[in-house]
């Protein structure tokens, strides 16, 4: 301990905050028993005649009737519980692995990139947080590459059908039982649609409610879950299938604009399939229950709208441009999102601290005082932060005051699979399960960012101690993780 008692002071502050948190959180429970005791004492003082007169009165009958009707209305109108039976993440074949050296060799052989562009990609790749075993489609491994419609369809079929085959095998669900289908893929939207491709492959029923979301970026996986959840509130006793993926074949950039070269270094093959149910009996065999979804859209701001933008360069080569303001815009979107999410998940102790700090800052016009960032670790146990890149994970770790353990799943997913777009949050959840860390009652926060600009959150609660499903994408390599990442 130093002369000023620094460690002791910090430890004391932590204990005081913890005590405050428990006092405020359980305040109403602590007050309930004394109030009930007073109520029973008052009732015991009433005479038998008083009670008989009260029970025989019209008012008593009215109150009882009102209570019964109110209870019926409440139970009929409350939202249906949405359960996650299981999910599956696609594991590409080993032949599609791409090391740093192979990436750079292939890029130099293509002869579309200048020496400056090759060096830029090399530096981005080294600093990206990606490992040596991420995957690219066969069309990009080819020299020259094959960015054809047929190759793009082939990639989509491999990823989507691979994830779905494993999901149906693990759940033993007949595909014709599915009543809702939501597919999201931002940059590849053929005709017929990807959702129609799934209906055709698995012979889904003719009255299925089918949706195909395009152009919505890396946060579209949460949007798809939210849409499926809304549909399950309307349609009783059915399943919803959510498929999230991205397609690289026709979206590889072959130009020399630096802002458009970054996605080449980050995005990799991946996809997920999630099976949801609103059937009460499915609770027993489900892994998770959906607690909240919160969606934030900053598209009304021009800078936010343009920060992730598909366009053509001066040579008419198409790619996705990433703005230098991306992280600042993501930070603003995050603040807006957690402002809405906080009251739904945070203990009242944190809400009071946040509100008091906000009011004090406004009253005293103290612009230098930083806003109070709620401690989400008090309400959430696991964090699945979209593995968009090292900078994204770093920013959220800093903003939310998370520990390296809290962002481990995100960093390791980025290292092992790269940025798989909207499906990355499911690879992260699979990592947590493979590590044996998911216990009954644990709460999981999935948070993703996407073009538009959007920040979307989903919160789940584990219904049991969750074991990894068969063919979990980490099952053959989890013993090697976490790995040390040199940045």
From Swiss-Prot:
A Pfam match is ACP_syn_III_C
Induction of the gene: Repressed by herbicides such as flufenacet and benfuresate.
Catalytic residues? 218, 297, 382, 386, 415, 419
Keyword match DNA damage: no
Q: Output one GO BP term.
A: fatty acid biosynthetic process
Q: What class of enzyme is it?
A: transferase
The catalytic activity, as recorded, is: a very-long-chain acyl-CoA + malonyl-CoA + H(+) = a very-long-chain 3-oxoacyl-CoA + CO2 + CoA
Q: Which UniProt keywords apply?
A: Acyltransferase, Membrane, NAD, NADP, Transferase, Transmembrane, Transmembrane helix
Q: Which domain of life is it from?
A: Eukaryota
Q: Which membrane topology term applies here?
A: Multi-pass membrane protein
Q: Record's Gene3D superfamilies?
A: 3.40.47.10
Activity control, per UniProt: Inhibited by K3 herbicides such as alachlor, allidochlor, anilofos, cafenstrole, fentrazamide and flufenacet. Strongly inhibited by metazachlor.
Name the organs or tissues of expression.
Expressed in flowers.
What pathway does the annotation place this protein in? Lipid metabolism; fatty acid biosynthesis
- Indicate the transmembrane segments per the record: 23-43, 57-77
A GO molecular function term, named singly, is: fatty acid elongase activity
Subcellular location per UniProt equals:
Membrane
The catalytic activity of this protein is classed by the Enzyme Commission as 2.3.1.199
Q: Which family does it belong to?
A: Belongs to the thiolase-like superfamily. Chalcone/stilbene synthases family.
Function as written in the Swiss-Prot or TrEMBL entry? Active on saturated acyl-CoAs up to C22. Mediates the synthesis of VLCFAs from 20 to 26 carbons in length (e.g. C20:1, C20, C24, C26).
| PANTHER family, per the entry | 3-KETOACYL-COA SYNTHASE
Instruction: Provide the protein name.
Output: 3-ketoacyl-CoA synthase 17
Q: Which organism is the protein's source?
A: Arabidopsis thaliana
Q: What is the lineage of its organism?
A: Eukaryota, Viridiplantae, Streptophyta, Embryophyta, Tracheophyta
């Amino acid at each position: 301990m130093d002369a000023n008692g620094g460690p002791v002071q910090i430890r004391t502050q932590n204990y005081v905050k913890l005590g405050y948190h428990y006092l405020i959180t359980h305040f109403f429970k602590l007050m309930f028993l004394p109030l009930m005791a007073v109520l029973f004492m008052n009732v015991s003082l009433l005479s038998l005649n008083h009670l008989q007169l009260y029970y025989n009165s019209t008012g008593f009958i009215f109150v009882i009737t009102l209570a019964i009707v109110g209870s019926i209305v409440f139970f009929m109108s409350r939202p249906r519980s949405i359960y996650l039976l299981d999910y599956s993440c696609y594991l590409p074949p080993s032949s599609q692995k791409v090391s740093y050296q192979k990436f750079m060799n292939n890029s130099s052989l293509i002869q579309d990139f200048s020496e400056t562009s090759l060096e830029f990609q090399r530096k981005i790749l080294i600093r990206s947080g990606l490992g040596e075993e991420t995957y690219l489609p066969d069309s990009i491994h080819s020299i020259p590459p094959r960015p054809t419609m047929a190759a793009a369809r082939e990639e989509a079929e491999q990823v989507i059908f691979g994830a779905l085959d494993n999901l149906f095998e693990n759940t033993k669900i007949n595909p014709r039982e599915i009543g809702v289908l939501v597919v999201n893929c931002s940059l590849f939207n053929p005709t017929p649609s990807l959702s129609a491709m799934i209906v055709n492959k698995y012979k889904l029923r003719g009255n299925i409610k089918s949706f195909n979301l395009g152009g919505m970026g890396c946060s579209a996986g949460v949007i798809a879950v939210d849409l499926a959840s809304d549909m399950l509130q309307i349609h009783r006793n059915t399943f919803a299938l959510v498929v999230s993926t991205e397609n690289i074949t026709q979206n590889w950039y072959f130009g020399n604009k630096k802002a458009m070269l970054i996605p080449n270094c980050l995005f990799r093959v991946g996809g997920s399939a999630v099976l949801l149910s609103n059937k009460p009996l499915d609770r027993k065999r489900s892994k998770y229950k959906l607690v909240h979804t919160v969606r934030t859209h900053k598209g009304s701001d021009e800078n936010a709208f343009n920060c992730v933008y598909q366009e053509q360069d001066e040579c008419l080569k198409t790619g996705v441009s990433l703005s230098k303001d991306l992280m600042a815009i993501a930070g603003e979107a995050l603040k807006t999102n957690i402002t809405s999410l906080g009251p739904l998940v945070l203990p009242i102790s944190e809400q009071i601290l946040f509100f008091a700090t906000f009011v004090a800052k406004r009253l005293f016009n103290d612009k230098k005082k930083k806003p109070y960032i709620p401690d989400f670790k008090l309400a959430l146990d696991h964090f699945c932060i979209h593995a968009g890149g090292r900078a994204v994970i770093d920013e959220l770790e800093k903003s939310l005051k998370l520990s390296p353990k809290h962002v481990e799943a995100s960093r390791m997913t980025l290292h092992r699979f790269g940025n798989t777009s909207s499906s990355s949050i499911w690879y992260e959840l699979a990592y947590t399960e493979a590590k044996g860390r998911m216990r009954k009652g644990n709460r999981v926060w999935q948070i993703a960012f996407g073009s538009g600009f959007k920040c979307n959150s989903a919160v789940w609660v584990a219904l049991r101690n969750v074991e990894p499903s068969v063919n979990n994408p980490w099952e053959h390599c989890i013993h090697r993780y976490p790995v040390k990442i040199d940045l």
